[in-house]
Amino acid sequence: MTHAATAPPEPAPTPAGLDAGFERAARAAGGPVDLRLAVAGSAVRVRFAGTTAADALGRAFAHLVTARDDAPALTLHVWDSVERPAFAAGRPSEAETPTTGAGPSYFYDELEFRALHQPASDVLSVLSADGAAGWFWMPDATRLPYWEYSAPFRHLLSWCLDAQGCRQVHGGAVGTKDGGALIVGPGGSGKSTTALASLLDERLRYAGDDYVAVGGEREPFVHSLYCAAKVHHDDVHRLPHLEAALADGDRADEKAVLYVATAFPGRSIAGFPLRAIVLPRVTDRRTARIVPASHAAALAALAPSTIFQLHPPAREALARMADLVRTLPSFVLELGADVETIPAELVRLLERLD
């Protein structure tokens, strides 16, 4: 998924107008539905306008739900409606709408808030200047592209995490409570295959396949954001342990979406210390093998897609990711035809680094 930030096509939204739009939608849907989460050590309250939006977008956070009633660091207001907020220009025609990524975006950053409209998926994300309030609008919660279900509110969370000293990155992560690996690479490199293959081994826990957050002052620590995963339909046969659990998309060009916390109870994890950076690479080998990689290769696999997809301040984000790859050893995971050999290689690596 790539993005090109441009000037806003319409007048900017206002927090008051967004609040009013949410309240109207909530009343029409029978009232708000609240979801309380613990995200990267912070309390987050998500207010959905009705059960339809909550059911559609809340499943990706099932492993982060908490019964604690702490004051939220961030409150998100999530609704769908025919009425369009300011700044959300009309969606392009079907011929112009990308089917395999989020396409270009319109970004707006002012003293009072920042906003991002993605015409391809037709969603609007707005965050207040203090990072305490966010708004996420969509025209229909039941008709979003697959990537919005697998990684809801990713830009809002990225902006908020930045203020807390965490960096959301384009990568997956698997490991144990004692330590794990960040899995990085461009689309098609095997990140999801590697992360989902870990479910074959009871020793490993799943923290994400596409977006996670990295923080930690004394040692790098990965925070899970989503328990959802995406699988190309053409790859399902290589991961037969997932077939019964896949929530299939309704278009032939979609990836299938899997909710790990539901399909594999106890296998999702909120986070762990980072021990290594792993770069999957598709090869013609039969079995998987791990070999050393350079810090430069790790940065090249991590930074470009993170910056293009999540819109962080590029210079600062690049510096922080460069610091991260200098801190950790990096390895290439040569993927073979036998996917079931992947988790054993990861376990051996983590045991060696422990």
Regions of interest found by a model, annotated:
Residues T2-G187, A197-A207, V212-D354:
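A noncatalytic interaction/capping subdomain that flanks phosphate/NTP-handling catalytic cores
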Residues T194:
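Hydrophobic positions on the alpha1 helix immediately C-terminal to the Walker A/P-loop
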Residues S189-K191:
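Conserved glycine(s) of the Walker
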